[in-house]
Amino acid sequence: MGIFLAVPEIIAASIAGGAEALSIAGSGAAIATGEGLAALGGITEGAALLGETIPISEAATTVLTKVPELVQATQAVTAAVQGGAGLVGGIYTALASDHPGDLPPNTPTGSASGLHPTSGYNPQGAGLNLQSVHKPIHAPYSGMALVPIPEYQLETGIPGIPDWLFNLVASYLPELPSLQDVFNRIAFGIWSSYYNAGSTVVNRVLSDEIQRLLRDLEYGFRATLASIGESDPVNAIATQVRSLATTARERELLQITAGQPLDLSRPTSALSAAAGALTEAAYNFIYDASSLPKDGFNALSEGVHRLGQWISFSGPTGGTPHYATPDWILYVLEQLNADTYKIPTQAVKRKQDELHPVSPTKKANKAKKSSSPGTNSGNRSKKRRGRSTSRSTTVRRNRI
C-alpha cells in the first residue's frame, strides 16, 4: 500500500500537469491503464533517435507513472475485499456514505470520485463554494491561506478508486474518519498550500487505520465462515433428533441392565413434546421461507444462498438485503413436518412381557384356580374323550 502514501503528490501533480498528461495519453482511461506511460516512453525514445529533446514537465511524468500504479493497488484491494465477501454470500456495493467522524455533520459527500465537494469544510459556518473561486474565503484553520482551484480540475478525482473505498473505513470502524474525509483533508491541505499536513494525514491514517481495517475484515471473514458450519438448519435439526434418540436409548439400556420396568409414559410424552416443538418450528420456518424470495433478485437460476443467510446483491429492484433459501432445505423441513410414526403398543407390550416375566405369586394363583373342583371341567373332559372315541371308530369303519 505504499502507493497510497503518494496520493497527495499525485493530486498535486494532477493539478499542475494534468492537462499535459491528458494530451500525451489521449484520455483519462489511457492514463489509468498505463497506455499514457507507454505513449510517453514512445515519444521520448522517438525524440532520442531523432536527436531532439521534447520538454515534458515533471508533474505530467508523475501523473503518467503513478496513476497506473495507484489504479492497480486499488483494484487489488477491491478484488481482495470482493473475494472474501463472496465466501460469505456477497458484498454490499454501496456502503454508508455519511460518517463524518470528527468533522461537522454537514461534510459534503462530493462527486462520484469523492474528491470534489459541492460545498467545502468551514468550521465557522461561512461555507466554501468552489463555483465562486474569486471570492475571498476563510481558511479552515487559522494561519492557512486557502487557495481553491476551479471545479473542472478535480471533477474526475483519482481515476481507478471506487466509491466504496472512500467509505470502507467508516462502515466497519465508525469511530474513525472515512476515507472520503481523509481525502477531503488532503485536498484542503493542498489547496491551502499546506502540503505537509496532507502527507501527515495520509501517513498516519492510511498506514495505521487501513491495517486495522484489513485485520477487522479478516476477522469478520473468519467468523462468518465459522458461523456457516454452525448455522445450517438441517444439521441443527439432525443433531437435536440424534441427541434425543441417543438419550432415550441410553436411558432404556440402563433400565434393562438394572432390571427395572420401562416407564413408557415419560419417554412417550417427551418424544411427543419434542416432535410437536420440532413440527411447530419447521412449520414456522417453512411459512416464513415460502413468503421470501428464493432467487434474491440476483438474476441467477437458484439464487445466491449460504444455507439461508442474509445477503445483499444488486438486481432489478435494488441492492436491499434478501433471504435466499435453497429448495432442498425446504424439502427436508417438509419431511420433518409430516406426522411422526406412532409407537406400536402391542410390540411394546410384548417387549415388556419378554423382559419382565410373570411373578411366582401370579403363577401360584393360576395353579389354584386350575385345580379347583367343578362339574364343568369333568363333563368337558368326558365329552372330549367320547368325541375322540367315536372319531376313531369312524375311522376304523372307513378302513374296513
From Swiss-Prot:
List the biased-composition ranges (Basic residues): 380-400
Give me the Gene Ontology terms describing cellular component: host cell; host cell endoplasmic reticulum membrane; host cell nucleus; membrane; viral capsid
Q: Which UniProt keywords apply?
A: Capsid protein, Host endoplasmic reticulum, Host membrane, Host nucleus, Late protein, Lipoprotein, Membrane, Myristate, Viral penetration into host nucleus, Virion, Virus entry into host cell
Q: Where is this motif: Nuclear localization signal?
A: 359-369
Segments of this protein annotated with the region DNA-binding = 347-394
Q: Give GO BP annotations, semicolon-separated.
A: symbiont entry into host cell; viral penetration into host nucleus
What domain of life? Viruses
N-myristoyl glycine lipidation: where? G2
Region annotation (Disordered) ranges: 99-118, 348-400
**Stretch list, region D1:** 307-342
**Composition bias, kind Low complexity: at what positions?**
370-379
Protein family membership: Belongs to the polyomaviruses capsid protein VP2 family.
List the protein's name.
Minor capsid protein VP2
Species, as recorded: KI polyomavirus (isolate Stockholm 60)
